[in-house]
Each structure stands twice: as C-alpha cells, then as structure tokens.
UniProtKB/Swiss-Prot annotation:
Zn(2+) binds at E81, H99, H101, H163. This is Ribulose-1-phosphate aldolase. It comes from Halopiger xanaduensis (strain DSM 18323 / JCM 14033 / SH-6). Residues 20-42 are annotated as: Disordered. The lineage of its organism: Archaea, Methanobacteriati, Methanobacteriota, Stenosarchaea group, Halobacteria. Its EC number is 4.1.2.-. Aldolase involved in the non-carboxylating pentose bisphosphate pathway, a nucleoside degradation pathway present in some halophilic archaea. Catalyzes the cleavage of ribulose 1-phosphate (Ru1P) to dihydroxyacetone phosphate (DHAP) and glycolaldehyde. Can also catalyze the reverse reaction, condensing DHAP and aldehydes. In vitro, can condensate DHAP with various aldehydes, including glycolaldehyde, acetaldehyde, propionaldehyde, isobutylaldehyde, DL-glyceraldehyde and DL-lactaldehyde.
Amino acid sequence: MILETERRAVVEHASELADLTPGRTGNLSVRGSGDDTDAGPGDAFAITPTGVPYDGFDVEDVPVVGTDGERLDGEMAPSSEVPMHSAIYRREDVGAIVHTHSPWATALAVANQPLPPIHYMIVAVGKRVPVAEYAPYGTDELAENIVTAMTEAGSTASLIENHGLVVTAPDLETALENTHHVESLARLYLESRSAGLEPQTLTDDQLETVLEKFESYGQ
C-alpha cells in the first residue's frame, strides 16, 4: 500500500475536523515521500475522501494524489479541494494542510476581514492571517488565490473570502493545533469587537521578539 503511514494519519486525525467544521465540509491532507509511487519524492499526498463522514472510511479508502492532481490510489474519490492542496504543496516547507469552515474564522472570512496580530500566539502562523480572494471551491483559481495570499502575507494560514480557513504546517499535528489557534484568536477578536472594544495589535518588533523566544520554547 503506497503512503500507508500518511493514509493512517489521515484516518487517525480526520475525526478532529468534527470539532472545527460543520457536517462533512472541510478536509485535510499529509504529504508523503512519493518514493513508492510513480510521482517523484515529496510529490504525492494522502487526503480525506469527498462527502464521507469523518469516521466513515478506512486506510485503504484514503485517496493518494500526486501534486499534479492525478489520483494514484485509494478506494474512494478525493476531496473536491485537490487543486488547493496540490497548489499549496508546491511550497517545500508544507507537509500537511487543514481546511475548515470553523465558525469564528469563517465569520471573518465572510466579512473579508483579515485577522490582525491581537495576541502573541498569532506567530504560530505568521504576523497576521490574510484573506484570499473568493473563487468557486475546487477550482484552480481559488487554489492560486490562496497561495498568493499566504505568500504575500508571509503566513502559513489564510482565510478564504466567503468560504473558510486553510492552515499549513510541516506535519499534521501542528497544522491541526494551529487551526485551533487561529479559530481561538478569531473568536477573541470578534468578541472584543462585539463588546464595543477595539483590540490592540502588536507591533512588528514585538512579534519579532516573540518569534525569537519561540525558538527556545518547549522540550
């Protein structure tokens, strides 16, 4: 079975989407080595299947797709957002992608409002979370809009206008953790604004200090 480790990771973590996105919307993927496929090294990924409950598929069902969009393996059809995942994986630092319609982040997205640096934890994904311009879901146009927004903002996450949120990371656990961070910060921002308050934003210098401290954080 090709990309077995990555497919198992998709099955293991897919249920976590249930806490982040309604119904069967949203998707996640993990980049594989590609060494055991016809794709080149790093040029294939395992992704959640389309339209299936998060606990409704097994390892052999998980689709494997090349970064060129070609379906390589898996009993089920891949997510409709394959173009988005394929485009983002052009960035060599990306090892996993999580896409949700989580309510607080999506509330910002439908208002076309980026998430500013109101809390130091935003540095988990960058200095702000931009909004990618709207395009129909599952299209190459949307995929390119997302890549452009993240690249221009220097962010590993982006809101998607009138749609939702996408977060990238070197691994799936970090991508999911950072998705929760963005959702939490979006809630803080919107609740502060709803209370008639004006959230204060951190300066670039303050954010740089946080980034330096993060380099020595953890075990």
